């Protein structure tokens, strides 16, 4: 649908608070029988601890002058959520917590998303544990989700050896990982195993050899 108008605003309110806002209005398309729609996103972020932050987000799609003969999927689709990003003061640990709830006049499109990860990365060691949950009735008409009704669990870890010789290669080492996919009843659907060997060069280029098994 053709965009009629839009506005975008973002910036720091002070040293701890940041806000972001975007709004787009589309024009009605009589040929395709689409109503005009308003798309809006608002985020409010608060700095916590030394390097971490917590954010609230609201995403809205609202049909304008919708009637029963038009082809729009619903009168509105909204998502509200919270996100917490953690970074340790020594820059070794990082993590995330994310929760989203979809709101819709259609009962089968009112679901949830919960995702999280925790990771550790030093000059030699790195590992990460990640999970994702998307319910079967979650809906995000503004944005994209790969699929519904799944749980993903992933673990990766690696180690780097540093060269002492005056050669282009800076470091090299193995990385292993395993990923599991389940439906929301926790019936296993798929799994992937991986083994990579990384080569990092002093000019910041990287070469990776890898094996994947499903």
List each language-model region with its residue ranges.
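Active-site cores of enzymes that catalyze phosphoryl transfer or operate on phosphate-rich substrates
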Residues: 1-65, 129, 151-153, 203
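Surface-exposed extracellular loop regions of Gram-negative outer-membrane beta-barrel proteins
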Residues: 18-20, 39-104, 166, 171-175
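Outer-membrane beta-barrel and related beta-rich outer-membrane complex signature
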Residues: 33, 68, 141-143
């Amino acid at each position: 649908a053709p965009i009629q108008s839009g506005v975008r605003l973002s910036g720091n309110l002070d040293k701890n608070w940041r806000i972001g806002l975007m709004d787009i209005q589309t024009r009605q398309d009589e040929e395709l029988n689409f109503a005009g729609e308003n798309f809006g996103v608002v985020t409010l972020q608060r700095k916590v601890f030394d390097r971490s932050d917590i954010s609230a987000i609201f995403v809205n799609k609202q049909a304008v002058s919708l009637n029963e003969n038009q082809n729009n999927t619903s009168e509105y689709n909204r998502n509200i959520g919270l996100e917490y990003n953690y970074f340790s003061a020594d820059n070794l640990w990082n993590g995330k917590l994310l929760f989203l709830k979809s709101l819709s006049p259609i009962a089968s499109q009112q679901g949830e998303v919960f995702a999280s990860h925790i990771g550790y990365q030093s000059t030699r060691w790195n590992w990460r544990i990640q999970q994702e949950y998307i319910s079967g009735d979650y809906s995000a008409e503004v944005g994209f989700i790969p699929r519904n009704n799944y749980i993903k669990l992933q673990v990766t870890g690696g180690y780097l050896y540093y060269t002492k010789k005056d050669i282009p290669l800076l470091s090299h080492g193995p990385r292993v990982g395993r990923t599991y996919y389940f439906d929301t009843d926790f019936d296993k659907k798929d799994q992937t195993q991986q083994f990579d060997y990384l080569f990092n060069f002093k000019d910041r280029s990287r070469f990776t050899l890898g094996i994947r098994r499903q």
